């Protein structure tokens, strides 16, 4: 079975709200083995919605609409659905009763226009709304399914889980299972080059690369009769990719760099401290994202000025005078200094030129040094990251964590 999603609402077209419903629906449909072929947005215009329904049903046998079930005149989704299937509208007494009870519980008076929400196309399966006043419905005809859902996420999510999923499972066989491999230290083009033969020859399972937030993900997806069979298709492919990419793969599914590192530090009773200049606390902040990091994170210092570098973490004045604040030598002394002063096993530092000004020919904007002190061993890495100030800082943090991971785990 193939599906399409149509978001109805001028507010979405204008960018006033973000269409998170499509993301939720696509994920849930994929879990059921239903492929989403197309997504679209139409304003509160009946003719355009009808045109979109016509085109959608040429490609797919399931069309899901979100929005347009409200009480106003421009909420026309159900009426257009009825026109498309040549059906009349009828008053669903139970839905009207539920709407009245909802208003009563809210201490409000039912407006006459809210009764409009209790009207549905004939022969519809009604989907109760336990969190609002707009019930949904499903129309079925000649192996075509039109599923009309409300717009607010707090209403559509429980409605889809409680009513739509059980309904569709009666008609759909098989599951679509995905596993995500998370990669750091390689760009998307490099990853694709290394595993291109797997991507070009894919059928089932499939491999889909995606770059985001200075990392690359590979989504491995298999379709089978059940989850066990799907995973048996994914595992050999995963092993082959791991053999190629090695320790550039840091985790799977919902893993994060900071989570992988934090878990390792806690399990091995290791303590860490950070000293940051150009990243201004972002590095420590990433570590704090991991619940339980208090068991191993001693402190984080933002030593932005030279005085702070000298007085707080013991960077030598001679080092700053000779090499400058942005240098390998300073980065090493920062990492070692924060580890020694805090009693941590590991110190990590950042110092660089985030821009947009302040760069020179020898030390351009984007230059950064990341220093490490790991159980008595000190070293630093030099990088030049293009982009604006914020992207440079974010990239620095991700790379700093990844090099720490590769030197620890």
Curated annotation (Swiss-Prot):
It comes from the Bacteria. It holds the Pfam family CinA. Transmembrane segments: none annotated. PANTHER family: NICOTINAMIDE-NUCLEOTIDE AMIDOHYDROLASE PNCC, NMN AMIDOHYDROLASE-LIKE PROTEIN YFAY. Belongs to the CinA family. This is Putative competence-damage inducible protein. The gene is cinA.
């Amino acid at each position: 079975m193939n599906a399409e999603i149509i978001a109805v609402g001028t507010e979405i077209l204008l960018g006033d709200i973000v269409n998170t419903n499509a993301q939720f629906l696509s994920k849930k449909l994929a879990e059921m083995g239903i492929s989403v072929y197309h997504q679209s947005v139409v304003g509160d215009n009946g003719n355009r919605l009808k045109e979109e329904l016509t085109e959608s049903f040429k490609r797919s046998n399931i069309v899901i609409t979100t929005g347009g079930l409200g009480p106003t005149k421009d909420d026309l989704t159900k009426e257009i659905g009825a026109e498309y299937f040549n059906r009349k509208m009828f008053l669903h007494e139970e839905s009207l009763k539920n709407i009245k009870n909802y208003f009563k519980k809210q201490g409000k008076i039912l407006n006459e226009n809210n009764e409009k929400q209790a009207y549905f196309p004939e022969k519809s399966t009604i989907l109760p709304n336990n969190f609002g006043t707009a019930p949904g419905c499903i129309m079925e005809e000649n192996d075509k399914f039109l599923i009309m859902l409300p717009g607010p996420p707090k209403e559509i999510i429980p409605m889809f889980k409680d009513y739509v999923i059980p309904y569709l499972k009666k008609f759909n066989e098989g599951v679509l299972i995905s596993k995500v491999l998370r990669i750091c230290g390689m760009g998307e083009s490099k990853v694709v080059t290394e595993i291109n033969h797997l991507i070009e020859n894919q059928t089932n399972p499939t491999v889909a690369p995606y770059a985001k937030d200075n990392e690359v993900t590979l989504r491995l997806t298999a379709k089978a009769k059940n989850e066990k069979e799907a995973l048996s298709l994914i595992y050999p492919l995963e092993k082959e990719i791991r053999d190629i990419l090695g320790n550039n793969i840091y985790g799977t599914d919902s893993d994060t760099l900071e989570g992988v590192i934090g878990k390792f530090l806690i399990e091995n009773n290791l303590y860490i401290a950070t000293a940051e200049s150009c990243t201004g606390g972002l590095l420590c902040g990433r570590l704090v994202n991991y619940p339980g990091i208090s068991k191993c994170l001693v402190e984080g210092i933002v030593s932005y000025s030279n005085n702070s570098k000298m007085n707080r973490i013991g960077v030598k004045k001679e080092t700053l005078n000779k090499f400058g604040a942005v240098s390998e030598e300073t980065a090493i002394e920062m990492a070692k200094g924060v580890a020694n002063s805090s009693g941590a096993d590991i110190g990590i530092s950042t110092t660089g030129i985030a821009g947009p000004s302040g760069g020179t020919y020898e030390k351009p904007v984007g230059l950064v040094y990341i220093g490490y002190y790991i159980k008595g061993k000190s070293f630093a890495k030099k990088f030049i990251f293009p982009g604006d100030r914020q992207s440079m800082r974010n990239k620095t943090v991700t790379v700093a964590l990844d090099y720490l991971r590769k030197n620890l785990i």
